Amino acid sequence: MKYTLTRANPDADTYPAQTRQTVNNPIEDEVNRNVFMGKLEDMVHASANWGRKNSLWPFNFGTSCCYVEYATTLTAVHDLSRFGAEVIRASPRQADVMIVAGTCFVKMAPVIQRLYEQMLEPKWVISMGSCANSGGMYDIYSVVQGVDKIIPVDVYVPGCPPRPEALIQGLMLLQESITKERRPLGAYVNDKGIYQPQMLPERDRKQADRIAVKNLRSPDSI
């Protein structure tokens, strides 16, 4: 059997030298991939946000024709349940995301505000359609020029009306935003020990203001 010696070619296509990666300590690399290295607080926030983004309960609230497209996302064609948001709630006290689908009239504004206040924390709002975003083509006295003038909005979905795919994309953007949030939990551990923020419900927090009211506002005012 004869052998021949050839000089190594670094530019060869077979086993190119420039793509080889060396591992200094394979045990350390294996540990970093399988063992969590970080703060317990970060892990708790990540776990809580993961559960929140995959269990969004929308509030069944439609004000105009955009609600037809919103309802289409619940059908088998689009299947909103893939994103954990198929549990539609009829009560704001059981929902954590309000999807304002359609035109917001001046007479609806106090109702939307009150329903938003009744939602439990943490809560989010998706503005769906041009009318909910900026009033749309209704630049008149009876239409609120954007639902963000009465309640805070997290995600805007453009369109007149937007397609169901656009709403699903907006929901995915909201889930991505929830993943990066650091909202206060019920109780967690910090450098000073166990900390539990005092988060009063809206009913108790605004009880003194309601008692002090002498003249009730008109239902068609903002």
Swiss-Prot record:
SUPFAM superfamilies: HydA/Nqo6-like. It holds the Pfam family Oxidored_q6. It catalyses: a quinone + NADH + 5 H(+)(in) = a quinol + NAD(+) + 4 H(+)(out). One of its GO terms (cellular component) is respiratory chain complex I. PANTHER family: NADH DEHYDROGENASE, NADH DEHYDROGENASE [UBIQUINONE] IRON-SULFUR PROTEIN 7, MITOCHONDRIAL. This is NADH-quinone oxidoreductase subunit B. Its main location: membrane. HAMAP family: NDH1_NuoB. NDH-1 is composed of 14 different subunits. Subunits NuoB, C, D, E, F, and G constitute the peripheral sector of the complex. Its EC number is 7.1.1.-. [4Fe-4S] cluster binds at C65, C66, C131, C160. It is a peripheral membrane protein. Its cofactor is [4Fe-4S] cluster.
